[in-house]
Amino acid sequence: MASRSGLSACIITYNEADRIEACVRSVGFCDEVIVVDSHSTDATRELAAALGARVIERDWPGYRSQKQFAVDAAGSDWVLCLDADERVSDALRQEVEQLRAGGFAGYAGWSVPRITDYFGRFLRHGNAYPDRLIRLFDRRRGGWIGREIHENTRVEGRVGRLRGHLEHYSYRSLTDHHNRMQKYADLMAQSLYAAGKRCGLGKVLFNPQWRFFRGYVLRLGFLDGWRGLVFALVESNYVRRKYLHLYIRCRGLPS
């Protein structure tokens, strides 16, 4: 019979005092909680430490590098990775605990469906759901890869699918959502250009429309009511800004 596996929760933070407590409490079932903080100026570190988390301060190198640092600092081979604006639901916790009891036998990782809270209600359609991510994995067989923005995980071996939700409480307001997506668009354009990617006018004109149509119509985002419409419009603006900035950069102009 397989023995119970150890499990470390890995979280990265910067000025998340209003959300870190709920996040840390949601992973209280783990053997340890690691918080890697990039010099928050609020009470993030103190609040996390008060709940028993092991807090490590580190300069900000980018999303992928910071998340991988947290994984490397884990004391267990199995890790559960989440952001400060995410929480493990009760259903997901129960699933993970059942898997731990069996030592996660036969798997290198598990994907979880992330569900986003948008103005007080979870989005259940469109491009926002189900946002499947590999967040539970054996760090000996996987880790964080990709660019420093829109990073992801990759594991070598069998990946299972969990049903319990990872709850995402990301956007404090419409302005916060808009500003954050504009920031991500600029960073993504810079990353794509540095990687040698190029962009024609067609992507600037048509990719935003396709992103909106796919999410709002094909993936039934309209069933989320006005929230689904607003989310799809902000997404479309993100795609437009990303390709517009890449298009400008490709022509040797400052973006």
Language-model segments: residues:
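Cell-envelope/extracellular polymer assembly enzymes that use nucleotide-activated donors
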Residues: 6-8, 32
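Short, well-formed alpha-helical segments that are part of the catalytic scaffolds
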Residues: 11-29
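Acidic helix N-cap motif at the loop->helix transition within catalytic regions
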Residues: 18-21, 42-51, 91-92
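A conserved acidic beta->alpha catalytic loop
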Residues: 26, 37-47, 83
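Short, structured coil segments at secondary-structure junctions
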Residues: 29, 50-52, 75, 132, ...
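Short acidic donor-binding/metal-coordinating loop in glycosyltransferase active sites
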Residues: 38, 58, 76, 83-86, ...
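Glycine-rich, basic loop-to-helix element that forms the pyrophosphate-binding segment
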Residues: 59-74
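Catalytic-site signature of metal-activated, phosphate-bearing donor transferases
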Residues: 68-71, 78, 89-255
